[in-house]
From Swiss-Prot:
This is Small ribosomal subunit protein uS8. PANTHER family: 40S RIBOSOMAL PROTEIN S15A (PTHR11758). Part of the 30S ribosomal subunit. Contacts proteins S5 and S12. Belongs to the universal ribosomal protein uS8 family. GO terms for cellular component: ribonucleoprotein complex; ribosome. GO terms for biological process: translation. It comes from the Bacteria. It comes from Buchnera aphidicola subsp. Baizongia pistaciae (strain Bp). One of the primary rRNA binding proteins, it binds directly to 16S rRNA central domain where it helps coordinate assembly of the platform of the 30S subunit. Pfam families: Ribosomal_S8. The keyword Magnesium does not apply.
Amino acid sequence: MSMQDPIADMLTRIRNGQFASKISVIMPSSKLKVKISILLKEEGYIKDFSVNSTNKPILEIFLKYFRSKPVIENITRVSSPSLRIYARNNKLPQVMSGLGIVIISTSQGVLTDQVARKKGLGGEIICNVS
């Protein structure tokens, strides 16, 4: 049985791992998941991640906590395979008045909402993180 939405699965694994106070979560890897992980690390939402390529590539994300509480309070999928959500550069949403991030897939790669605004790019809204 194939997975219908691998990005939603990734976000759910991160959310469930943090609720269970896990050190890390493991999932199948893809280029898009690695790019999302890079953004989450740059923005300080996760400690680190690694990709292990034995037979099938596996992505391991090391979760981050502050005073024994998860750094990620909320992580939700916006665009799904059945309902794609796009936004122009002047209509990009903000999470918690700019305290959170929106991850967007643009023509120049996967970017946060702040970087996409500076570059004047719109695209598919992948998820919100706060």
